Amino acid sequence: SPAYRQAWIALALILPISGFVMYYLWGRSSRNKKKLDQHILRQISYGNQFLIHDEQAYQKFLQENPVAGRMVKYMETAEFPLSAANDVKYYPMGEDAFEDIFAALEQAEDYILIDFFIVAEGALWDKTFEILKRKVAQGVEVKFLYDDFGAAIRTGKYFSTMLQKAGIDVRVFNPIHKYTGELYMNFRSHQKIVVVDGKVAFTGGFNLADEYANLIERFGVWKDTGVRVSGEAVWGLTIVFLQMWEASSTDPEHVGYLRYRVMPESTGDTYCHVISDGPANNPFNPIESIYNQMIMYSDEYLYITTPYLVIEDYMKQSLIEAAQRGVDVRIITPSIPDKKLVKILTYYNYGSLLKEGIRIYEYTPGFVHAKQILTEDAAIVGTINMDYRSYYLHYENGIWMSGEQIQEDIRKDFCATFEESHEVSYEEWKNRPRRYKFIEPVLNLFSILL
């Protein structure tokens, strides 16, 4: 992206030596990075051949939902097939999700697939590990995938070895090497997926760390959201997991995808697209386009929750145009941030949106880490932040859903969160502290790098 290049050029001009070092470490597209992209694309291409395209569900949805059908057509071309008759449960808090995740793990009889960005030692991990060890002893296959950067700081040096000794099949995505040229703080797997026996799967914004279930307090109440799915959408999440599993190894032998295929028994009423994306796809980034389409096709209301609001001008304009055509546009961000500089930049971005009638709320109980978007036609819940890093630099996943009950459940949570949040006015924004006004233009110059 031109903005990405311009940010690095500006940094190099302001900080000639350290700016170049930072670009060398994190900004460049090196030979090793290109090899990694090619390897990942091969695994994605291989896994895509196992996707199930339900032509009957596709045609039925197009007839019933002509507006949302435009998005469905796009997602079909992007290799995110539509599935019908899924049963979906929404979790308004991370602790609610983990309660059901543990229950599902306890019931596992065949296999467990787990993928998290952040893994941290603590009470949540201890309980997870205890269940996994017991399941391995019962003959259940357990595959555990995690991102090296996300887990490096909060797990022990021999974390991977500990899992292997327990009989868990473990892989690490994009290991951080001691060699400077291979240290990638970008290009991480930000995905979160749990699949049990091919019958039930979970995803959302939560990681495997105590704060995500409010077992410890870091930034007040930690609000995260997620979903549990049963039905054909489980197979979609299984494929995403297996694609990244194979991308995390140089083993030329593929896993047997069909070994994990279970015919769905769900009779739910929710249409789903399992969506995923990452830097190997650059410059074709379907998730960014799907988010923009959600904004553009909204007609009645558009509700968004994101911990970081760092978006490019074209998406700001899409939000403004939605408000101008009468859509009720509301955005929830944290009151207590986890990244102070990003918070200042997020607050700076309020201005042009508030001026055009978009309503912005800050979650006063603490930090909102949830990533979701809702319109009258559909919803997305997953790992995707509204920032450049999620759209271009990380591997992400989510579920696009269209169904009366799941949309109503998500809408109720939005409305409840509005009630316990502070609505920021345009006048309040204009009267923000002078120190913010001084630093904002500088931060905005490097917004894509934050």
State the predicted function of each range.
Residues S298, Y308-V329, P334, K339:
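Helical hairpin unit composed of two closely spaced alpha helices linked by a short loop
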Residues T305-T306, Y363, G382:
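Thr-Gly-centered strand-to-loop micro-motif
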